[in-house]
Curated annotation (Swiss-Prot):
Subunit structure comment from the entry: Component of the cytochrome c oxidase (complex IV, CIV), a multisubunit enzyme composed of 14 subunits. The complex is composed of a catalytic core of 3 subunits MT-CO1, MT-CO2 and MT-CO3, encoded in the mitochondrial DNA, and 11 supernumerary subunits COX4I, COX5A, COX5B, COX6A, COX6B, COX6C, COX7A, COX7B, COX7C, COX8 and NDUFA4, which are encoded in the nuclear genome.
Ranges that cross the membrane: 12-40, 51-86, 95-117, 141-170, 183-212, 228-261, 270-286, 299-327, 336-357, 371-400, 407-433, 447-478
Positions of Cu cation binding: 240, 290-291
Cofactor note: Binds 2 heme A groups non-covalently per subunit. Binds a copper B center.
Keywords (A to Z) from UniProt: Calcium, Copper, Electron transport, Heme, Iron, Magnesium, Membrane, Metal-binding, Mitochondrion, Mitochondrion inner membrane, Respiratory chain, Sodium, Translocase, Transmembrane, Transmembrane helix, Transport
Residue sites binding heme a3 per the record: 376
GO molecular function terms listed in the Swiss-Prot or TrEMBL record: cytochrome-c oxidase activity; heme binding; metal ion binding
Species per Swiss-Prot/TrEMBL record: Ornithorhynchus anatinus (Duckbill platypus)
Gene that this sequence comes from: MT-CO1
Protein name (database record): Cytochrome c oxidase subunit 1
Reactions this protein catalyses: 4 Fe(II)-[cytochrome c] + O2 + 8 H(+)(in) = 4 Fe(III)-[cytochrome c] + 2 H2O + 4 H(+)(out)
Binding site for Na(+): 40, 45, 441
Stretches assigned to the Mitochondrial matrix side: 1-11, 87-94, 171-182, 262-269, 328-335, 401-406, 479-513
Cross-link (1'-histidyl-3'-tyrosine (His-Tyr)): 240-244
A biological process term (GO) from this entry: respiratory electron transport chain
Length: 513
């Protein structure tokens, strides 16, 4: 029975739970890697060895956090659990494919871990640029294993994307229009479209890199008429939509939390929110070369990518101000999920502002590959995506488990995490402006103070992670059952109780048009 339920599952709730557990586990691994990075940088001099092992850790940290933590939790975990419940579907459109999407991830994770144990590991950075990723600078199988890992994770995501698109378009009640679905459902739909369009380009790029390394092709080798810049274009045509894939489901989660704990029936500007997400999704595909301002592009090309990138701030601003308008006049409950959501809105906005700075090609030429960039994307990921995940988790934990978290521990957890991530990443803006480059394991001692503070912050965040583990244990040990849930008519995922029965919506749902 155990094997049938958990290995061969076709139930969206069980598969969602598997994704959440896998993502939590990978998140621990990714956190451990980040602690190694910050320990190395806590003071000048060397702790772990040379730059190769350091860059292997940095590369693994990025891949683990992106492909095995944020995406499985947001899309696989929350997506699987909530999308069918929110649209009144009995399950996903392709339940067995859903199971395969999940089970491609553990082998993918294994390949990534193995890649760092053979030869000297893949110390390429998550971008895997040739010629550093070529077979001279990285002889041996490590980069090849990392590429295979990416292939598996990519196939998993593409299949999941097909499944979500089909489910959301086809499995609504006949009378329900697409514009009556909740914003989280919209965010997953748009994310799935982005995945479907961007991942094949990554697959093409890394497959060409694989043949360059092993079959003597020269796609990215000037000696044979290739061009390493082509790889950068292919990678970032995937890589930029990818960062929006990481944050869009978070937008959906935050919309639900802000609406719910403001006591509102609906978010402010529903249609504006939907169009904003669609605009962000579209614009995300036409700004990729802002990651490449330093490779020597024409001034008119740089002008285009600068202005196109800045345009994304407009739909993003629509979302931020709509969240604030949703709060306005509401009966605000200062619950832990609401704290995460408010933290998200503020810190994501700060990260967005540094993004506007980096969008200027003239400034980016100075700031490219410095800690300013690291600070920017960790503000939108470590305090955007992660805060959304935490907010969604503490908000929907009673739905998933049937038990309530201890609110005091949840607030302690939030406070520690808030202090930790800000202490870690705010000083990195100063390091970047002072010219400290990324991806080095050592630095001149002029940079010591801010690095020491940054590393101190990472240990505060580590403490927060441990508090979270305790908080989850405490909830399951105390078994406080959910008494009642408010606002169920406008939050239909709660209608079936906590937790909902194994099968929901077995008979078709009829809604008034």
């Amino acid at each position: 029975m155990f094997i049938n339920r958990w290995l061969f599952s076709t139930n969206h709730k069980d598969i969602g739970t598997l994704y959440l557990l896998f993502g939590a586990w990978a998140g621990m691994a990714g956190t451990a890697l980040s602690i190694l990075i910050r320990s190395e940088l806590g003071q000048p001099g060397s702790l772990l060895g040379d730059d190769q092992i350091y860059n292997v850790i940095v590369t693994a940290h990025a891949f683990v956090m992106i492909f095995f933590m944020v995406m499985p939790i947001m899309i696989g975990g929350f997506g699987n659990w909530l999308v069918p419940l929110m649209i009144g579907a009995p399950d996903m459109a392709f339940p067995r494919m859903n199971n395969m999407s999940f089970w491609l991830l553990p082998p993918s994770f294994l390949l990534l871990l193995v890649s760092s144990t053979v030869e000297a590991g893949a110390g390429t950075g998550w971008t895997v640029y040739p010629p550093l990723a070529g077979n001279l600078a990285h002889a041996g199988a490590s980069v090849d294993l990392a590429i295979f890992s990416l292939h598996l994770a990519g196939v998993s995501s593409i299949l999941g994307a097909i499944n979500f698109i089909t489910t959301i378009i086809n499995m609504k009640p006949p009378a329900m229009s697409q514009y009556q679905t909740p914003l989280f459902v919209w965010s997953v739909l748009i994310t799935a479209v982005l995945l479907l369009l961007s991942l094949p380009v990554l697959a093409a790029g890394i497959t060409m890199l694989l043949t360059d390394r092993n079959l003597n092709t020269t796609f990215f080798d000037p000696a044979g008429g290739g061009d390493p810049i082509l790889y950068q274009h292919l990678f970032w045509f995937f890589g930029h939509p990818e960062v929006y894939i990481l944050i869009l489901p978070g937008f959906g989660i935050i919309s639900h939390i802000v609406t719910y704990y403001s006591g509102k029936k609906e978010p402010f500007g529903y249609m504006g929110m939907v169009w904003a997400m669609m605009s962000i999704g579209f614009l995300g595909f036409i700004v990729w070369a802002h990651h490449m301002f330093t490779v020597g592009m024409d001034v008119d090309t740089r002008a285009y990518f600068t202005s196109a990138t800045m345009i994304i701030a407009i739909p993003t601003g629509v979302k931020v101000f709509s969240w604030l308008a949703t709060l306005h006049g509401g009966d605000i409950k200062w619950t832990p999920p609401m704290l995460w959501a408010l933290g998200f809105i503020f810190l994501f906005t700060v990260g967005g502002l540094t993004g506007i700075v980096l969008a200027n090609s003239s400034l980016d030429i100075i700031l490219h590959d410095t800690y300013y960039v690291v600070a920017h994307f960790h503000y939108v990921l470590s305090m955007g995506a992660v805060f959304a995940i935490m907010g969604g988790f503490v908000h929907w934990f009673p739905l998933l488990s049937g038990f309530t978290l201890h609110p005091t521990w949840a607030k302690v957890h939030f406070t520690l995490m808030f202090v930790g991530v800000n202490l870690t990443f705010f000083p990195q803006h100063f390091l970047g402006l002072a010219g400290m480059p990324r991806r080095y394991s050592d630095y001149p001692d002029a940079y010591t103070l801010w690095n020491a503070l940054s590393s101190l912050g990472s240990f505060v965040s580590l403490t927060a992670v441990m508090v979270m583990i305790f908080m989850i244990w405490e909830a399951f040990a105390s078994k406080r059952e959910v008494l009642s849930v408010e606002l169920t008519t406008t939050n239909i995922e709660w209608l079936h109780g906590c937790p909902p029965p194994y099968h929901t919506f077995e008979q078709p749902v009829y809604i008034k048009a």
